[in-house]
Design a protein with these regions (language model features):
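S-adenosylmethionine/decaboxylated-SAM
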Residues: 3-159
Length: 159
C-alpha cells in the first residue's frame, strides 16, 4: 500500500514523518473501529478515514473527541495561543480562513465539513475526553490514537 500522509491546506500537529508512521501502524493492525482523542483541525482524522476507507473497503467507523476550541471546558491543559488567534505563516491561508471564510479550523463545524466525505462513518464528540469517554461504548474500538491533552494526568486518564 503506497498511501502517504497528506497535510492539506490546514494546520496539523502531526508532521508527515510521524503521520506516515501512524499509517504504517494502521496498515499492520487493520482496525475497523478507530478512536482518536485530540482531533485538532482534522488533518490526521481525514488521513485516517481515507486510509481506512481503502483498506476496509468502506467498512469502518471513526470516533473523534476534542474540545474543538471550547474555552469554557474545565480541564487542566494550557491552550496553545496559536489555536486562539489562528495565525498562519502563509498569508494566503490567513486571508482564506480568517477573512474570506471566517472559519475557525479547530471548530466542530469546520472539522465536520472537512470530513464530510465520510459523514456516515464519522462520530465527533465535543468535550473533555475524561468526561466523553465515560459515555461511549468503547468495547468495539480496536485502535486508539491518543493525542489530546498532553498533561500527564490527562494522558493517563485517556489510556
Amino acid at each position: 500500500m503506497n498511501f502517504k500522509f497528506k497535510k492539506y491546506w490546514r494546520k496539523t500537529g502531526l508532521n508527515p514523518k510521524w503521520g506516515n508512521k501512524l499509517i504504517e501502524l494502521i496498515n499492520q493492525k487493520k482496525p475497523h473501529h478507530f478512536l482518536e482523542i485530540g482531533v485538532f483541525c482534522g488533518v490526521t482524522s481525514r488521513n485516517i478515514c481515507e486510509f481506512l476507507n481503502i483498506i476496509q473497503q468502506g467498512n469502518f467507523t471513526y470516533t473523534g473527541i476534542d474540545l474543538f476550541g471550547d474555552d469554557n471546558e474545565d480541564n487542566n491543559e494550557k491552550k496553545p495561543i496559536y489555536i486562539k488567534h489562528q495565525k498562519f505563516s502563509n498569508p494566503l491561508k490567513h486571508i482564506y480562513y480568517n477573512i474570506y471564510l471566517k472559519e475557525n479550523l479547530n471548530s466542530l463545524e469546520s472539522v465536520k465539513k472537512f470530513l464530510k466525505n465520510f459523514e456516515e462513518k464519522v462520530y465527533l464528540y465535543k468535550g473533555n475526553s475524561n468526561k466523553v469517554l465515560k459515555n461511549l461504548d468503547i468495547k468495539k474500538i480496536d485502535f486508539a490514537f491518543i493525542d489530546g491533552g498532553h498533561s500527564y494526568q490527562t494522558t493517563l486518564n485517556d489510556i
